[in-house]
Amino acid sequence: MAAIEVGRVCIKTLGREAGNTCVIVEVLDKNFVVIDGGVKRRRCNLKHVEPTDKKVDLEKAASTEEVKLALDAAGLL
Protein backbone atom coordinates (compact mmCIF):
# COMPACT_ATOMS: atom_id res chain seq x y z
CA MET A 1 0.00 0.00 0.00
CA ALA A 2 1.43 3.34 -1.04
CA ALA A 3 0.52 5.73 1.76
CA ILE A 4 0.89 8.94 -0.22
CA GLU A 5 -1.09 8.69 -3.46
CA VAL A 6 -3.96 10.43 -5.21
CA GLY A 7 -7.26 9.43 -3.61
CA ARG A 8 -5.82 8.48 -0.21
CA VAL A 9 -8.12 9.60 2.63
CA CYS A 10 -6.23 11.41 5.41
CA ILE A 11 -6.86 13.17 8.71
CA LYS A 12 -5.44 16.67 9.24
CA THR A 13 -3.33 16.65 12.43
CA LEU A 14 -2.20 20.28 12.69
CA GLY A 15 -3.66 23.69 11.91
CA ARG A 16 -7.13 25.14 12.21
CA GLU A 17 -8.62 22.20 10.31
CA ALA A 18 -7.05 19.58 12.62
CA GLY A 19 -9.22 16.49 13.01
CA ASN A 20 -11.01 16.93 9.68
CA THR A 21 -11.07 14.32 6.93
CA CYS A 22 -9.41 15.18 3.63
CA VAL A 23 -8.30 13.50 0.40
CA ILE A 24 -4.99 13.80 -1.43
CA VAL A 25 -5.79 15.30 -4.84
CA GLU A 26 -2.25 15.79 -6.15
CA VAL A 27 1.27 14.92 -5.00
CA LEU A 28 3.55 17.93 -5.53
CA ASP A 29 6.87 16.56 -4.24
CA LYS A 30 8.25 14.49 -1.35
CA ASN A 31 7.09 17.05 1.24
CA PHE A 32 3.85 18.59 -0.09
CA VAL A 33 0.47 17.46 -1.42
CA VAL A 34 -2.74 19.22 -2.45
CA ILE A 35 -5.69 18.20 -0.25
CA ASP A 36 -9.43 18.74 -0.59
CA GLY A 37 -12.65 17.29 0.78
CA GLY A 38 -13.66 18.18 4.33
CA VAL A 39 -11.10 21.01 4.28
CA LYS A 40 -10.38 23.98 2.04
CA ARG A 41 -8.43 22.95 -1.06
CA ARG A 42 -4.79 23.86 -0.46
CA ARG A 43 -1.18 22.75 -0.45
CA CYS A 44 -0.31 20.89 2.73
CA ASN A 45 2.89 19.61 4.31
CA LEU A 46 2.91 15.82 4.68
CA LYS A 47 3.86 16.25 8.34
CA HIS A 48 0.40 17.78 8.88
CA VAL A 49 -1.66 14.82 7.59
CA GLU A 50 -2.07 11.24 8.77
CA PRO A 51 -2.98 8.79 5.97
CA THR A 52 -5.68 6.20 6.66
CA ASP A 53 -6.18 2.80 5.06
CA LYS A 54 -9.13 4.14 3.01
CA LYS A 55 -8.83 5.24 -0.61
CA VAL A 56 -11.34 6.76 -3.03
CA ASP A 57 -11.14 6.53 -6.80
CA LEU A 58 -10.05 9.95 -8.13
CA GLU A 59 -8.20 11.35 -11.10
CA LYS A 60 -5.14 13.55 -10.49
CA ALA A 61 -6.17 17.19 -9.85
CA ALA A 62 -9.87 16.28 -9.52
CA SER A 63 -12.29 19.15 -8.90
CA THR A 64 -13.80 19.85 -5.50
CA GLU A 65 -17.19 18.55 -6.70
CA GLU A 66 -15.64 15.25 -7.84
CA VAL A 67 -13.92 14.87 -4.47
CA LYS A 68 -17.15 15.49 -2.55
CA LEU A 69 -19.06 13.01 -4.73
CA ALA A 70 -16.38 10.35 -4.20
CA LEU A 71 -16.41 10.89 -0.42
CA ASP A 72 -20.23 10.70 -0.33
CA ALA A 73 -20.20 7.50 -2.38
CA ALA A 74 -17.68 5.97 0.05
CA GLY A 75 -19.75 7.14 3.04
CA LEU A 76 -16.92 9.23 4.48
CA LEU A 77 -18.58 12.67 4.55
Swiss-Prot record:
GO molecular function terms attached to this record: RNA binding; structural constituent of ribosome
- Quote any Pfam family the record assigns: KOW
A single Gene Ontology CC annotation of this entry is:
cytosolic large ribosomal subunit
What are the alphabetically sorted keywords of the record? Ribonucleoprotein, Ribosomal protein
Does Ribonucleoprotein show up as a keyword for this record? yes
Asked if Ribosomal protein is a keyword of the record, the answer is yes
Per its UniProt record, what InterPro entries does this chain match?
KOW (IPR005824), Rib_uL2_dom2 (IPR014722), Ribosomal_eL14 (IPR039660), Ribosomal_eL14_arc (IPR023651), Translation_prot_SH3-like_sf (IPR008991)
Q: Which GO terms describe its biological process?
A: ribosomal large subunit biogenesis; translation
Q: Which Gene3D superfamilies match?
A: 2.30.30.30
| TM spans (from-to) | none
The cross-references to NCBIfam families, in alphabetical order and at most eight, read:
PRK04333.1
Return the similarity comment: Belongs to the eukaryotic ribosomal protein eL14 family.
**What is the protein name for this chain?**
Large ribosomal subunit protein eL14
Originating species = Methanococcus maripaludis (strain C7 / ATCC BAA-1331)
Q: What's the source species' lineage?
A: Archaea, Methanobacteriati, Methanobacteriota, Methanomada group, Methanococci
